[in-house]
Amino acid sequence: MSRVKRGVTAHARHRKIIKKAKGYYGRRKNAFRTANQAVEKAGQYAYRDRRTRKRNFRALWIQRINAGVREHGLTYSRFIDGLAKAGIEVDRKVLSDIAIHEPEAFKALVEQAQAALK
């Protein structure tokens, strides 16, 4: 059996990691071992924060809806309860967008929610 020298494969693997570490500070960008650790840690942060981003956006939408609803004398939780009782199924992302860009339509939704609460 012939001898397998891994120089080409190893070099390609190192090059791939160094390329991913482009823009990092200090040795992290050009020393393979530290670059490898930095790239792996970056991947862990990215994985974690892709999930955190979903929570952050939901919280932002809720804050925007709450601000819009309070202008009409209602709280967020009462508004959501009113929408559910009125049978209006609109998600928070859309409600947030309506509250910002279409105040008249949002006011109509608030009035429907208030009517359903009574």
From Swiss-Prot:
GO terms for biological process: ribosomal large subunit assembly; translation. NCBIfam families: rplT_bact. Belongs to the bacterial ribosomal protein bL20 family. SUPFAM superfamilies: Ribosomal protein L20 (SSF74731). This is Large ribosomal subunit protein bL20. It comes from the Bacteria. Gene3D superfamilies: 6.10.160.10, Ribosomal protein L20. InterPro entries: Ribosomal_bL20 (IPR005813), RIBOSOMAL_L20_CS (IPR049946), Ribosomal_protein_bL20_C (IPR035566). The gene is rplT. Binds directly to 23S ribosomal RNA and is necessary for the in vitro assembly process of the 50S ribosomal subunit. It is not involved in the protein synthesizing functions of that subunit. It comes from Parvibaculum lavamentivorans (strain DS-1 / DSM 13023 / NCIMB 13966).
